[in-house]
Amino acid sequence: METSTQTKAGSLTIVGTGIESIGQMTLQALSYIEAAAKVFYCVIDPATEAFILTKNKNCVDLYQYYDNGKSRLNTYTQMSELMVREVRKGLDVVGVFYGHPGVFVNPSHRALAIAKSEGYRARMLPGVSAEDCLFADLCIDPSNPGCLTYEASDFLIRDRPVSIHSHLVLFQVGCVGIADFNFTGFDNNKFGVLVDRLEQEYGAEHPVVHYIAAMMPHQDPVTDKYTVAQLREPEIAKRVGGVSTFYIPPKARKASNLDIIRRLELLPAGQVPDKKARIYPANQWEPDVPEVEPYRPSDQAAIAQLADHAPPEQYQPLATSKAMSDVMTKLALDPKALADYKADHRAFAQSVPDLTPQERAALELGDSWAIRCAMKNMPSSLLDAARESGEEASQNGFPWVIVVGVIGVIGSVMSTE
């Protein structure tokens, strides 16, 4: 049974709505909005605002605390205090912010820290950020070849380092050096300071992508490609606004460390990797990237094997009851049910009808692998082996670690076609 050391009435949950109107709000976020005693929100489009108001009638719009010439930091302090005050009254409060509620958001972090320090239950739920949208719309993978993310003014003030071998993402490029707020937009008159730094690091002809995520479902994102020098042109500079983000692709690819490749045994003895990583698809925004064919001999061989594919012996398809599927969905989307389960696993599991004995036992235990075994109808001996020998069980066939992605960098080292 899992119990909480925090017994104070009142809680704070911070959620995000994503960037694109309504559609990027998670089911988890929506469930907390619906269950809250009071909701405070700060969103950027009226459709999302209207949607929130249909899900909970006890809502407060935090956007009203901005004002022309008013310090944004003062506004953020006020926003956080408004939420914490209601938590202190014993209410279950939800704070809603656009995008990811913890990415380039000040009041969410402040309110959470204060609530936690005073002994209240407080947590943040993830959301879709502008950077997530950027990765999707520009079709880039932050893991290849790595990514640095900065706020533009901080990037300049603290002389943050740049790696010309990695992606660079700069937020708030439309309000460089501006600490206050204006309903009509920002006079970005220090923008040239940012351009100077980019030219210093990358040169005048290096590409920069001006990115704005789509905020409405009928819109397309802005993905305009310029050179650093073109950013100095007034007609282009004035397109950069408060919701603009810059993506700067790598200037060059870093050479592989041959000694490390040998130590990791990524290549057969005597085989030497390419000087430049060759990965398909290539980054369309990056200059001088080697072309790679989509159907190399190794790809064709892998595709040919599909004709003879059969699920391996260790693969376990889903084999769960409707009762178990329904209760796991309820735990994911019903905050009250989740609280009841966390308070007493056994009592909750006993109250659920139509579970199989293995499913009920797993739910009582609350162990994620026990639940996986029950829903996949896997032998309980696998779970027992894992408990007895820990990591050793994974070497004997227990799926202790699930790998759902392949790092392209390793693949590029191993391919010499």
Curated annotation (Swiss-Prot):
Q: Quaternary arrangement and interactors, per the entry?
A: Homodimer.
Write down the Gene3D superfamilies for this protein, in alphabetical order. Cobalt-precorrin-4 Transmethylase, Domain 1 (3.40.1010.10)
According to its UniProt entry, the protein is used in biotechnology as follows: Omphalotins display strong and selective activity against the plant-pathogenic nematode Meloidogyne incognita but shows no further phytotoxic, antibacterial, or antifungal activities.
Task: List modified residues, type N-methylglycine.
Answer: 405, 408, 411
GO MF term (any one)? methyltransferase activity
Sorted keywords for this record are:
Methylation, Methyltransferase, S-adenosyl-L-methionine, Transferase, Virulence
Please give the organism: Omphalotus olearius
Write out the domain note.
Within the homodimer, the clasp domain wraps around the adjacent subunit to position the core peptide into the other subunit's active site for iterative intermolecular methylation.
What are the N-methylvaline sites (modified residues) in this protein? 401, 403-404, 406, 413
Residues binding S-adenosyl-L-methionine are 98, 100, 103, 130, 172, 213, 244-245
The name this protein carries in UniProt is Methyltransferase/ribosomally synthesized cyclic peptide omphalotin A precursor ophMA
Q: Identify which top EC class this enzyme belongs to.
A: transferase
Role this protein plays: Fusion protein of the methyltransferase ophM and the omphalotin core peptide; part of the gene cluster that mediates the biosynthesis of omphalotin A, a highly methylated cyclic dodecapeptide with nematodicidal activity. Omphalotin A derives from the C-terminus of the ophMA protein, and it is the ophMA protein that methylates its own C-terminus using S-adenosyl methionine (SAM). The C-terminus is subsequently cleaved off and macrocyclized by the prolyloligopeptidase ophP to give the final product.
The source's domain of life comes to Eukaryota
* GO biological-process terms attached to the record: methylation
Report the PTM annotation: OphMA automethylates at Val-401, Val-403, Val-404, Gly-405, Val-406, Ile-407, Gly-408, Ile-410, Gly-411 and Val-413 before being processed by the prolyloligopeptidase ophP which likely forms a peptidyl ester upon removal of the follower propeptide, which then undergoes macrocyclization with the N-terminus of the modified core peptide. Peptide backbone alpha-N-methylations change the physicochemical properties of amide bonds to provide structural constraints and other favorable characteristics including biological membrane permeability to peptides.
Similarity comment: In the N-terminal section; belongs to the precorrin methyltransferase family.
Q: What is its EC number?
A: 2.1.1.-
Q: Where is this region: Methyltransferase domain?
A: 1-251
The record, for Pfam families, names:
TP_methylase
